[in-house]
Amino acid sequence: METFCLKVTFWVALVGYVIGDHPESYSTNLSTPVDFTTFHGTELSFLVTTHRPTNLALPSNGSMHSYCPQQTKITSAFKYINTVISCTIFIVGMVGNATLLRIIYQNKCMRNGPNALIASLALGDLIYVVIDLPINVFKLLAGRWPFDHNDFGVFLCKLFPFLQKSSVGITVLNLCALSVDRYRAVASWSRVQGIGIPLITAIEIVSIWILSFILAIPEAIGFVMVPFEYKGEQHKTCMLNATSKFMEFYQDVKDWWLFGFYFCMPLVCTAIFYTLMTCEMLNRRNGSLRIALSEHLKQRREVAKTVFCLVVIFALCWFPLHLSRILKKTVYDEMDKNRCELLSFLRLMDYIGINLATMNSCINPIALYFVSKKFKNCFQSCLCCCCYQSKSLMTSVPMNGTSIQWKNHEQNNHNTERSSHKDSIN
């Protein structure tokens, strides 16, 4: 876990190092004075206008009345370093999430309720990594929106924020469902369930995806290609353009809505159900049946710790970005002559927050690898193609979705049957 934390600290420091000294690239009236595409996301930046734009026109010298007195800019090194970070997240996210899905799919005894929710979370992250990250890399290197002068660019402009918001919604709702599932598992501690995904879990997963897509519809509606003029040339960029009263309302409350639903809700849900789970465990410390099932309860507690770790990582990855948005919404005043220092701080926090938030799409498999030794063995066996010969038998321990362990053929049938029975525990 220490290695994992050090890696996160390294990337944060790296991003902070390449930030330039130009705070005013965050204009509240325009996405950026020259380059609309230097940020690591569409919705996850200050590129969204606070007022409804029509056709934007910049002065030929690229300056505006609201700019800070000092000239500022983003260093060119940022593009390439941020591209390396994006490519790393792309590779790790694609390999990690795909491997996680393969592990759960190929091992029949791993197909249980908690694992199904983890697979749903991994699939949502995989979709974002495969589709959205390449667009980010193109924007960073090309300095413009892809296909910005044809209909396919308009399609990407709507698809990009839609998938981005859907992916976050899938993550948030799956974490809530995992917290509820862990409470149910502890509350019904005497129930031993067989192999398979419960019907209620399947319904939850389908509902999570449908709700996530529905909540992301305003993003697809609001984001359009907005034309603007700069130095006598016509350009287009993808940004939020409120054209109706509902979209104007959505744009006004968007930061608070994202902070409340997509950040606070999973934390509150986890706090509530983990508190109930702790009370349940303390109230049932005694009893002969509980003693007999102590191993199963221990395994369930281990899964609860794993889920809690995923929630904590989610909070750490997304908190800086939400904090910068709330501060920008409540504290920053574009008419304040002393705003430049605050804007520099918000800009730094925003860059760090954007990269951390994007990193969350690849970090869950890594977290499972370090938190669970059994999951670590499973990843190693899958990635390194270490298959045991006829002298080894693969079985899965508790159906809590955390492990795979290996048993020798030399074990007697009695022990094998006991191991198979333990595999059915969720």
UniProtKB/Swiss-Prot annotation:
GO molecular function, one term: endothelin receptor activity
Localization per record: Cell membrane
Superkingdom of this protein's organism: Eukaryota
CC annotations in GO: plasma membrane
Organism annotation: Canis lupus familiaris
Topological domains, Extracellular: 21-79, 132-158, 229-255, 328-346
Glycosylation sites: N29, N61, N241
Transmembrane segments: 80-101, 112-131, 159-180, 205-228, 256-277, 306-327, 347-371
Protein name: Endothelin-1 receptor
